[in-house]
Amino acid sequence: MASTPSSGSYDLAIVTPTEDHSLRSFSLSQGNVQQTFLVSTQDGAFLDQQKASFLQSYSKDQSILGLVFEFLQFLLDEACPPAPLGAFLGAIESQCVRDANIHDLIVSEPEAKNIIRTYYRAHAVAGLNPRPAPSGLFSTVNIEAHRILMAFGGQGSTNLVCVDELADLYSLYQPLLEPLIASVAPALASLSREPSTLQHYLGREIDLYSWLTIPESRPDRAFTATAAVSFPIIGLLDMAHYYVLGKLLDSDSPKRLRSALQGLTGHSQGIIVAAAVAQADTWASFLAQAQWAIRLLFWMGYECHTAAPASPLSSAAIRDSIEHGEGSPSWLLSVRGLRSPALDALITDCNRRLPESEHLSIGLINTERNIVVAGSPRSLRGLCLRLREIEADDGQDQSRVPFRQRKPVVHHTFLPVSAPFHSSHLRAAADRVKERFPDASSPQVGDLLTAVYHTRTGQDMREMFSPSNNLIHSLVEAVACETVDWPATLQVSRSKPPSHIVLLSSSRLSDLVSEIVDGRGVRIIAGTVLAPTDPAVLGGKAELLTTKPSQAPTPWAELFKARLVAGPDGRPILETRLSQLLQAPPIITAGMTPTTVHWDFVAAVMQAGYHVELAGGGYFDAAGMTTAIEKLAAHVPPGRGITCNLIYASPHSIAFQIPLIRSMIQRGIPIDGLTIGAGVPSQDVVNEWIQTLGIKHLSLKPGSIAAIYEVIEIAKKHPTFPIILQWTGGRGGGHHSCEDFHEPLLQTYRDIRRCSNLYLVVGSGFGQADQMHPYITGEWSLSFGRPVMPCDGILIGSRMMVAREAHTSPQAKELILAAAGVADSEWEQSFKKPTGGVLTVQSEMGQPIHKLATRGVRLWHEMDKTIFSLPRDKRVAALNARKAEIIRRLSADFAKPWFGYNAAGDAVDLEDMTYTEVIARLIRLVYVSHQHRWIDPSYRQLVLDFTYRTLERVSNADYATDKLDLSQPEQFVEQVQQLCPAATTRRLHPDDVRFFLTICKQRGRKPVNFIPALDEDFEYWFKKDSLWQSEDVDSIIDQDADRVCILQGPVAVQYSRRADQSAREILDEIHHGLANHFEEGPSQSDRPSLAISEMVSARVTVTESNTHRIIRPTSESLPSVEDWQAFLASQVTGSVRSAIMAEEVLRGSQRQANPLRRVLEPRTGQSIQIPLDGRDLRLVEDAKNRPLVHIKPSGDQEVAVDFYYYDFVETPGNLRFTYKFDSKSLSLVENLDGRDDRVKLFYAHLWLGRADLSYHRLSEVFEGEEITLSSDLHRHLHNALRHTVPDATASATTNTLPLEAAIIAAWKPLMEPLFVAELQGDLLRLVHLSNSIRYTPGAAPLEVNDVVATKSQVRAVTIKETGKTISVEAQIFRSKTLVATVTSEFFIKGSFSDYETTFSHQDEAAIELKVQSAIDEALLRDREWFLLDDPTQSLIDKTLVFRLHTVTRWKDQSTFTSLKTTGSIYTKHWNGTEQKVGTVASEVVECHGNPVIDFLQRKGTVVQEKVPLKHPGLIDNGSRTIRLPLDNALYSSVSKDYNPIHTSSVFARFADLPGTITHGMYTAAVSRAVTECLAADGETGRLRSFSASFVGMVLPGDQLTVRIRHEAMCHGRMVLSVAAYREGTDEKVLQGEAEVEQRTSAYLFTGQGSQAQNMGMQLYDSSAVARSVWDEVDRRLLDQYGWSILNVVRANPKQITIHFRGARGRRIRDNYLAMRTETRMPDGSTRLEPILRDLTAKSESYTFFDSRGLLYATQFAQPAILLMEKAAFEDMKANGLIQEGAAFAGHSLGEYGVLASLVDFLPFEMMMSVVFYRGLVMQFTMERDSNGHTGFSMVAVSPKRVGKYFDEAMLRIVVDLIHRQSGKLLEIVNFNVEAEQYVCAGHVRNIYILSGILDLLSRSATGPQLVASLRSASDPAITDVAKEIAVYLEKAPQLNNPTELKRGRATIPLQGIDVPFHSSHLRSGVSVYRRFLEERIQAENVQVDRLVGKFIPNVMGKPFAIDRSYLEEAAAVTGSSVLRELALAA
């Protein structure tokens, strides 16, 4: 199929034809795929015309093949002439179908049927015959290799749709089927109209053509399902399938098909079709045979249907059957779930109650458990009722019922048939049919040309009957009267069973066949199915017609066959799939508590060479399990892995054990496997374990059939991961199910074996080789009539408990040896009574458990029956009723005796014991006196805990409890008696009874070994922790083993007959016994290798020269890795061959898969060069003919491996490894001498360009060279990114370099510390964890041509369980100024112990601590590390800031060798400034924490610079999806990171990577670029920091989605979370953070006039920070001046009266009186007077009033505005929104807001007082009339609104004219927006005049002329404008109230302002106000650096400065003598 690229559109493309003589091209295309055909020029032109019409309506959503055939169908619909149709069809044949068959092509096509239909119809219309199918199955058939049985279907569930299915087949293959239909249709029509049948069909005669072509003509399905119709139709359907198949194979003759068959048969009526087919040698004879077969089928159907015995049922009975899921009663009942003997017994029982005419009989045996019963509907319904009585209910849980006591799970349904076929009921009907086919006119058995297998016996009918026998009569008997034995029919038991069974049946016959033949090596092909759902299980029609050979599956007996191979010592080893996985014989010692809890026992088994499971169920905390695994790991043989067995039903244990195993594997502990018992985890849980733990295999122990299928589903979800299914059934020792051992295996084996990654291990009841052998061979299943079912391994447990190394006590072993055991058929009796010495009881988890039937266990069994079976609320009463008896039995028989005994030896309750009696009894039970040991350390503490309680309760004196001596427990009671004599006589207090019971159950304490009470917890006391005593009988009373619980299986216990064998001896005995059963096969080392010729003919080419053999994989199809490696191994010798074949490499105690096998995997473009003597091997890069890897022998049995790397370096890098082959573990052992140094030298050559290691120490500073950041670097970085992030181009147009340029600049100093000699580690296992790049605050970004120098230092080297982390910090300097800091973290995987090299330098986050009390101060002063510069100063009410640095050195992972914390202590002042007041100096050794930081974090608060957003969100669209480059070479070159894993596939494979991996730095750079695009508008300079952690592997070409979230703010910078995810899986591969600067901002503060009621109150309600500012000021103003600013803002009252009563009132009055202003006297002198002139020392109150509301009075408006601005600013600051370095400006009063927020030169409360004073001065120094009016106001003026002809110069002239002509104030005081807005202050009358004049100039037609004359006049006073002003002055009213001012065209009065701010009128108050400020402002509090360059004063309009020029200019503008003097001094 020709393909051409396209844009991905799904429109049909028209391709211009290309003329070539008489041929031309004609093309169709879909999406990016095009199909081109060669046709004649004439036909091509016609097809082009048709295509033009076709384009209007074709379906776009389909494949190219579907499109081609849709166009072909279009031609048919358009009645295309045969010539062009044939030409196009021929082109399809040659270009699409080619040498295949059309059925081959349509298997996966959704429109398969349409294609088939069109294909064959087109052939018919074009007059062409389809080419014969080149069947691989039938063409090359060999009777020995391919034994094909063909089977036809019969009656069944498809009866209802048989007509529909025939019609469907006819529509597909109508041209092929027409002869067959034509030959039989008349016969059926005639037969159904005969007089004898007419009455039955009655208008529903079989009109075949109508039924096939007109759906509406078909009778209802209930009628067609009857035998009278379905018999002939189903028979015809089967013959039609055969006819089509034969025609497709050979249109001339059916002989080709028939002769290829071993035989034919049919299910039920299908045998008639088989007999007809078997006689046909030509198509003509086939049609003749079809006619008699159809006639026979018709009469059989009709006669049987009409002869069916009447058996009326009531409607209620019918309804009942339907409601029970049995269907409508009929004459055949399918029964599934019962075997034939059981069903026979039921039938016999039913028949006893039935007349013979209604007897039941078995009609068909479909499978062992699928049987069909024939009889009348009434009788069959009776059988159904009987089945309901004995069967389990749907969904009934019988898991706790022993298997043999369960109700059978039976499914029984009526089949839609109308006669009791295969029964004696049809004898008369059969005779009538025979009469219609007399011998003379009927075929004979001898006419059969091929074997036809009889359905009763499975015999060839030619051997079963005489050749002259009437064939039809035999067939009638078989279908009507004789039982069908389908398994026998299928020949599976013959010596040469079929290799293939081809089914031509519309029914689900394949299910029946599959159940019978699975595992026997038979391929089932459903020849009626176009596309089977699972081709691996069931073939379809295409498989019959394809050229590809059809292979029969390998029988289970062969596929899973065990064999012998030679072990390392030459002795034979039994090998199965399991042993290949585990590298051990297939005998597993199961995880058992307590036996395999002990690491030494597990080690003994592993040292013996066998697999064993460490039982995690015996560990209750991580520490104990860690210790055990570490000890075990130290004792396991090299190359062997540990498997841990965990109890899934114990969530507490799983919660700590799974993370523990994960961490230990990460540390390198060789844990290979995990076994999960007591439950099957969910898919999600298993998926997480497989993905994250690092295990190599997982074993699951299902307890039921349902659980087995759960395991199967898990295996399907992880098809490449080994899952071991351990099946033990119910006969196993210890916990067990109630399941039969064999039955679940029989039911699930087929499905288990369909999962190639599932390993089947069986256990329970095993103990010797002879007994195990049938399970290894699979012969165990033969007795069940099933094929051989081999198991992969055997699980043993019980017998291992008597091994010498087992901790089982000798007394317990003796009891095990004495137990007789039982046969498998008897073990279920253990539920009721001791059986073979074993009894089943219910464990503490409520599960059945097998234990030896000791006295103790027999008591347990009795308690289960009589006590624990009761509801919990009834147990105590039952216990009390038998109290004396139970106590006696406990003390006499049980491992846990009754606790309560007094000194006299009488059994008593706990409350009746004295305190010393309790202590004495405790010691008696928990201390083993004759061995001088405590049973468990927690028991010793139990004694002490109760003794402490005793002393607290009974003694009145204080005793030092640490003086209690338990070293001699026997004398301990005497100590207590001496200390507290009363304890001897005083009985336990009720509280202490409860206390004792509580501490007995304390978590973490071993459960007590006695029964303290017969209470509601009796089951806990009795059952908890019951197994350990079998390993410590010495701790039991009288050392009586018959008291204890000993796990054993009832079947397996019989095989324990000796206690003197070691674990090795037991296992070797079994293993060698098994091996003796097998013929010795070839040894492992002598397995035949694949011949060269075979490989060459497959997928390898070999070229030989005189010296070498060059081997290459073919480019078309690479060989499998296994074949390739086996072939390479066959070409080399000695140690090189061992290096290739070894599956694992041992590196010290660590194991890993052999990397050389990965390196040598077949790859196009690489070849293998081997000398003819096979001594070495080179992997060669073909394109450049240079070696990449060289493997050669080196010394005795050693091999050296050289790796070469050529890119980016002048001389190739060379890295050598050496290995030695270990024959015992079959692994390579790596020589580690100097290995890590060689790796370092290799990378030093690549990264640093040198050939030696660093001479530095880790603590030194590493200096880099001074480099220039060139434009080439800028360009290369841009080029590396532009294809991935096309819109990241902004940086390319500027000289600003992206952030990652800093890493490139610092590359060598960052890398050099990795080569320090003292830094141990394998750099091949180095991964880059993270990068962080941060610009120094205020530093400009790096730019092209910057010259920078770099130095680095190692900040930390730390060791974790899985490796070593190295943190390196590099500082980049520009002009000797720090510009950026780069921090890189690296991680070297491995296990390290060189803690002496570890350290960490940590700059701690600043911590603020508020000293609020004397206690706080005392606590601080008490710290030794807290050193004040002045110890006498008080710290109370001060805020301390700690800025510290910690240096840490480690002893081990949790202990510090030393920890040194130093730094400075500062006090934080009210304005944020800090003053050093002390130091911190702390150094501690051998510690686990930082006492300084821990204390400060508890008492103080960590200063957080970043403020999280309340509602984080996505930036812009939030994400960008990008695709990474396919090659990493460009970025390697740019970044200088020449690590070969980025560019060399060889090194990547060696490192076990899925391919060359993309640089983490590149992924970070891409993510940075996306961040800039989305969050910084592409402005590189705005990105101030970027950090990235590399959390996932990224490959070239990966598609990533980068997501940006705005998470926080920091000093005005956006803090962004940056994450990159792999598209498709959403796996996170990068997590980072960026800080993006805002565009340069300015913060503007408004002035008076902006006030409004409730201003700032919304923020007050929502912000705690703003609220605290408001509240604090409100409190101060209320306290100082008696009024609430919150009230003023919220209510805007018109008046406030302040009362001066009491001490507080007098103080407030004094505050007002102290506020003075300067008043000029008539004589020119000045004096200070109170601002509130009518306030005296005797005033009792004062009232502020303003008719507009006091918020509009200056003295209240100004502080309110300032407070609102300050609160808003502090809220923004607290949220991190204030940008560092931003400009600040305030409009008028707003300047106070700037200074209060930016500089804090006054405490804000004082600033508020200053502004209040300022407002009062302005308000009350103005003269006011009786109404309070000053006569002044302000107005905003917009010259632009006057007209284009009016500007600022004209405004100045007009203002000046009004001022001069009126003699009153009018000035421009604010220049806000040039030409847009100005503010004038002046007398109200003048403002009125200004508004009128400007209105005149804007509205008058002469306005422009008036302004022009004013502009040109030498004296404005004589202009027309001046005259107009004079007119206004005369007419203007005597205004004094600003409220009368109206808005003009160019003017807006400022409402509420009656003070002419910023005007000369107020100048007189400047000196007084200056003095007022000077008294309050201290020079040292003015932080000038915060003002310079940031604050923009009103009077200057440019940033503040303190240089001379700025001061001079300011002095000139203001006329300030003070500024003038400062300028002179500057």
From Swiss-Prot:
Location of region: Enoyl reductase (ER) domain: 579-824
Listed Pfam families: Acyl_transf_1, Fas1-AflB-like_hel, FAS1_DH_region, FAS1_thioest_ins, FAS_meander, MaoC_dehydratas, SAT
TM regions (residue ranges): none
Superkingdom of origin: Eukaryota
Region of interest: Malonyl/palmitoyl transferase (MT/PT) domain: 1643-2016
Keywords: Hydrolase, Lyase, Multifunctional enzyme, NAD, NADP, Oxidoreductase, Transferase
GO BP field: fatty acid biosynthetic process
Domain MaoC-like: 1512-1625
Acetyltransferase (AT) domain as annotated region, ranges: 148-526
Reactions this protein catalyses: acetyl-CoA + n malonyl-CoA + 2n NADPH + 4n H(+) = a long-chain-acyl-CoA + n CoA + n CO2 + 2n NADP(+); holo-[ACP] + acetyl-CoA = acetyl-[ACP] + CoA; holo-[ACP] + malonyl-CoA = malonyl-[ACP] + CoA; a (3R)-hydroxyacyl-[ACP] = a (2E)-enoyl-[ACP] + H2O
SUPFAM superfamilies: FabD/lysophospholipase-like, FMN-linked oxidoreductases, Thioesterase/thiol ester dehydrase-isomerase
The enzyme's E.C. designation: 2.3.1.86, 3.1.2.14, 4.2.1.59, 1.3.1.9
Entry GO terms, CC: fatty acid synthase complex
GO molecular function, a single term: [acyl-carrier-protein] S-acetyltransferase activity
Pathway assigned in UniProt: Secondary metabolite biosynthesis
Active-site residue numbers: 268 (for acetyltransferase activity), 1788 (for malonyltransferase activity)
The keyword Transport is assigned to this record: no
Assembly and oligomerization: [Alpha(6)beta(6)] hexamers of two multifunctional subunits (alpha and beta).
Function per UniProt: Fatty acid synthase beta subunit; part of the gene cluster that mediates the biosynthesis of oryzines, natural products with an unusual maleidride backbone. The two subunits of the fungal fatty acid synthase oryfasA and oryfasB probably form octenoic acid. This fatty acid is most likely activated by the acyl-CoA ligase oryP to give octenyl-CoA before the citrate synthase-like protein oryE catalyzes condensation with oxaloacetate to form tricarboxylic acid.
Family affiliation: Belongs to the fungal fatty acid synthetase subunit beta family.
Protein name according to UniProt: Fatty acid synthase subunit beta
Species, as recorded: Aspergillus oryzae (strain ATCC 42149 / RIB 40)
